[in-house]
Amino acid sequence: MASKERVGVVIRNPQEKTVIVAVNNRVRHNKYSKIIIRTKKYQVHDHSHICKLGDEVKISEVKPISKTKRWIISEVLSSTVNPEKFGD
């Protein structure tokens, strides 16, 4: 079974090896057919401190690292994204 991957933006850097990544998902409303953007936040393990606020990153699902962390940073895609558009 392949691990799940998501692309999102780093919106917070609260602890030493943890970052919060916001991932946007576009879904169509069943009744009104309007496209809705849903945002989900993931706590992601950043062991080597490669992420900064606003970086666009790819995250991969792994076995549980702690109570709430089940994702790690796979790669940093770009560092020019504005984190304000994802909200906090």
UniProtKB/Swiss-Prot annotation:
Keyword RNA-binding: yes
Assigned GO CC terms: cyanelle; cytosolic small ribosomal subunit
InterPro entries, A to Z: NA-bd_OB-fold, Ribosomal_uS17, Ribosomal_uS17_bact/chlr, Ribosomal_uS17_CS
Keywords on record: Cyanelle, Plastid, Ribonucleoprotein, Ribosomal protein, RNA-binding, rRNA-binding
Example GO biological process: translation
GO molecular function, one term: rRNA binding
Xref: Gene3D superfamilies: Nucleic acid-binding proteins
Annotated localization: Plastid, Cyanelle
Pfam families: Ribosomal_S17
Highest taxon of source: Eukaryota
Keyword Signal assigned: no
HAMAP family, per the entry: Ribosomal_uS17_B
Function noted in UniProt: One of the primary rRNA binding proteins, it binds specifically to the 5'-end of 16S ribosomal RNA.
Record's subunit section: Part of the 30S ribosomal subunit.
Family per record: Belongs to the universal ribosomal protein uS17 family.
Name the UniProt record assigns to this protein: Small ribosomal subunit protein uS17c
